[in-house]
């Protein structure tokens, strides 16, 4: 095959510049399913960092300040960096609330409550299924009907009396209390069929619930919150309250999520969901979904267990080891979440020469180009850059691998080839 130089009149017929959309996703160590792609951006990825060495098998990990706690498959509570047996046990993965001073946490399964700090673990008579610290008090419930509030600035005080510990019996048409959160300086009460706000300023006799919204049956395990937003799943889809907008998050995932045994977590503008996902081809994959406010969403095909968000961290376990989610790096199994693949491109329907590529980006990345006749790998440092490729073929594909990058434009210049007569 010979490539001929053409006159100006013939030039447009034999040479073309094409914009290359990055439409598909893949991973370094396994399959990565993209739910929604952001135009001009490679999508926000996450990595993970191992916290425990696996010498003690755990099903859930909790870290607040210098305090570390692990829930073992046997139900035992293990504490400290060595995950030593605390002598306490739970009937299931406990709920966790960080202490106001940031140096520890309270863990409870609704029957047993244990305080874990850097100094060790102690049992308290403050059982809860869900709890939150707000307005100088500890708010907790075990049965979803009676809501206890602690004494001001003394959460350990158990004596019931005016100005001390008290409770509110709160039967409601929206059902039992499933979760408590403190979002945008307000106590949010997520019930079986809706969301309320607890007005708890001033005199204790004036504490009251105010309705915010009603919704379909709520999955309590999916609920998670940041300082500014609350996320949860219902039988009819995904809900958000606060600064985030529901239409900012990928809507693809909700009809494809099994609501059995899901666990949610949140950090920054990201919502994490441990669940089983039905992929577009009909296969079912167990993994961790990650969704952000810009519409990005993807499935990490690794079995994550015990997903929790505590303070400003997201933790999970895999293979009995504890991990924390990080902003950078690879996930389990070497999965890199910033790897994106274009659809096959056939510029002329016959053999062609890829002469050059032009990119405009922020941040470095590796561009790999393949054709049916060969491949090229090019490194870009960022900014506006044009590089020669000189790769022949009929069908071309483009693959971008980046740790952290925004790709604003990717285009390629092709020249059609002619057979020598």
Walk through the language-model features, giving the residues of each:
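Beta-sheet repeat architectures centered on beta-propellers
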Residues: 1-76, 81, 86, 90-100, ...
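Compositionally biased, intrinsically disordered low-complexity segments
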Residues: 5-7, 23, 119, 163, ...
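Hydrophobic beta-strand segments that make up the repeating blades of beta-propeller
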Residues: 68, 105-107, 187, 230
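Short beta-strand segments and strand-loop junctions that repeat across beta-rich extracellular domains
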Residues: 78-80, 112-116, 145-161, 198-200, ...
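Hydrophobic or amphipathic alpha-helical targeting/insertion segments
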Residues: 97-124
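Short hydrophobic-aromatic micro-motifs
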Residues: 106-107, 138-140, 231-232, 273, ...
